[in-house]
């Protein structure tokens, strides 16, 4: 008999939209989740992070930190200081979408613990963040690449989810105390087809099947009463009908631009790094210091291209550093400045109101900043803009596309029919379901789950993270 110990199982249903999940719960398509999780527990939502994209958006769960705090500001990024200092340095730029994915763990700040390092018997299924796992506990370490390549070239992701479920069930043989299991099918079929395509909905239903199998097994083992099951996502997404390739936009306007997969160019003037396809970072490289551009320096480097970009129908907004602790938001509908002071964050429209928040002149701490924006079109906008631009690897200009559009077309195979990554609520708000009640009902961030899991498990919480325990 396995020793009794608290167990946490976190289902990361990549790309799950809360409205789709609620519709499927209401229609009876998710009977196991309804019976075992919702009826005896809680169904709510949480705010993710910016960029809202796979990989960086796993960091709040597994480290309690936002992408900027973790020095990983996107699924692709460039380090200007490294780029200017080392012609052939391996840390000049990164894309975790390809062969550089194994460097994800090495790129994390070593002083910040992962959740795997806080448990005695943690297991992982499909997450690219694996630092701290005991030998043999990364259950898909040897097979993930094979499965993901198979699915990429065949457009068949259901077998990947089925294999993940097999490994999740296998983890129960190892007396686990924490299991992080990614189910990529919802996200992948949404990209390939549509967020509500039947193949996508079938991926939601398979998660329900997995939950039913898991709970039945835990009951047979006598562990169910001591188990916390959390079902959530790293981001939402929206259907995409048109693409504006941001790198091509700059290249066609006379700016020699470096972007993946063509990352070796002589004397590039700019670089574009896309995340989730709805968020892009522009790095201006026509200087030698490697320093981030501030205020008018961004417009001077990009010239008329910046105003032309902002006027395009595909663009929702752009943002850049306005000065120390200040960030400018620009859109066709207006401009605003977010300021960070020792007392908190403010939002001041200077023309129009790009985020639709009105004037927030009284400084707000991080909790109140979330409360003030949670129900808006840009949840947690003040905190997310701040955390991103406080990262030295973040671009000089951050661009978000409007829903229905994205920022990458060249070399994108297969074509994306859904996108995410932006600060819009349909990308930021994710489902949060768990088989417990009585937790703090305040607006939640996915970053809150790191210390929530530790506290529920009877372990010390970690100071200096971007979240607070909910229980």
PLM region spans:
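A structural signal for short, well-ordered beta-strand segments and their strand-loop junctions
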Residues: 12, 45, 121-127, 178-182, ...
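Active-site-proximal N-terminal segment of extracellular/periplasmic enzymes that hydrolyze or transfer
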Residues: 1-42, 52, 465
């Amino acid at each position: 008999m396995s020793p009794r110990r608290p167990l946490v199982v976190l289902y990361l249903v990549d790309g799950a939209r809360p409205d789709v999940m609620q519709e499927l719960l209401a229609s009876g398509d998710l009977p196991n989740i309804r019976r075992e999780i919702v009826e005896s527990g809680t169904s709510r939502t949480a705010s993710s992070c910016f960029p809202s994209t796979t990989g960086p958006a796993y960091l709040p769960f597994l480290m309690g930190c936002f992408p900027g705090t973790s020095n990983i500001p996107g699924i692709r990024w460039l380090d200007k200081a490294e780029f200017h200092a080392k012609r052939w340095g391996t840390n000049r730029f990164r894309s975790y979408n390809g062969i550089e994915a194994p460097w994800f763990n090495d790129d994390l700040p070593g002083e910040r613990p992962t959740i795997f390092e806080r448990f005695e018997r943690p297991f992982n299924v499909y997450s690219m963040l694996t630092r701290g796992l005991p030998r043999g506990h990364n259950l898909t370490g040897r097979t993930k690449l094979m499965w993901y390549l198979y699915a990429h070239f065949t457009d068949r992701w259901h077998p990947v989810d089925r294999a993940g479920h097999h490994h999740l069930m296998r983890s129960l043989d190892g007396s686990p105390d924490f299991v992080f299991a990614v189910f990529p099918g919802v996200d992948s079929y949404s990209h390939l087809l549509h967020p509500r395509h039947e193949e996508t909905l079938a991926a939601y239903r398979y998660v329900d099947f997995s939950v039913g199998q898991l709970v039945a097994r835990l009951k047979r083992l006598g562990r169910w009463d001591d188990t916390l099951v959390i079902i959530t996502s790293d981001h939402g997404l929206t259907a995409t009908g048109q693409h504006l390739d941001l790198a091509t936009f700059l290249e066609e306007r006379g700016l020699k631009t470096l972007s993946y997969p063509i990352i070796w160019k002589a004397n590039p003037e700019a670089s574009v790094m896309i995340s989730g396809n709805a968020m892009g970072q522009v790095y201006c490289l026509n200087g030698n210091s490697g320093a981030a551009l501030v205020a008018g320096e961004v417009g001077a480097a990009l010239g008329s291209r910046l105003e032309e970009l902002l006027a395009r129908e595909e663009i929702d907004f752009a943002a850049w550093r306005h000065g120390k602790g200040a960030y400018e938001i620009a859109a066709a509908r207006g401009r605003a400045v977010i300021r960070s002071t020792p007392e908190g964050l403010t939002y001041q429209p200077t023309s129009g109101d790009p985020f639709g928040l009105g004037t927030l002149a009284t400084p707000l701490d991080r909790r109140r900043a979330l409360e003030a924006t949670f129900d808006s079109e840009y949840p947690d906008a003040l905190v997310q803009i701040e955390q991103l631009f406080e990262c030295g690897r973040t671009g000089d200009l951050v661009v978000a596309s409007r829903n229905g559009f994205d920022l990458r077309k060249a070399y994108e195979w297969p074509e994306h029919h859904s996108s995410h990554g932006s600060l819009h609520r349909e990308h930021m708000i994710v489902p949060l379901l768990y088989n417990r009640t009585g937790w703090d009902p305040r607006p939640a961030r996915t970053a809150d789950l790191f210390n929530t899991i530790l506290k529920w498990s009877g372990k010390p919480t970690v100071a200096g993270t971007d979240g607070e325990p909910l229980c």
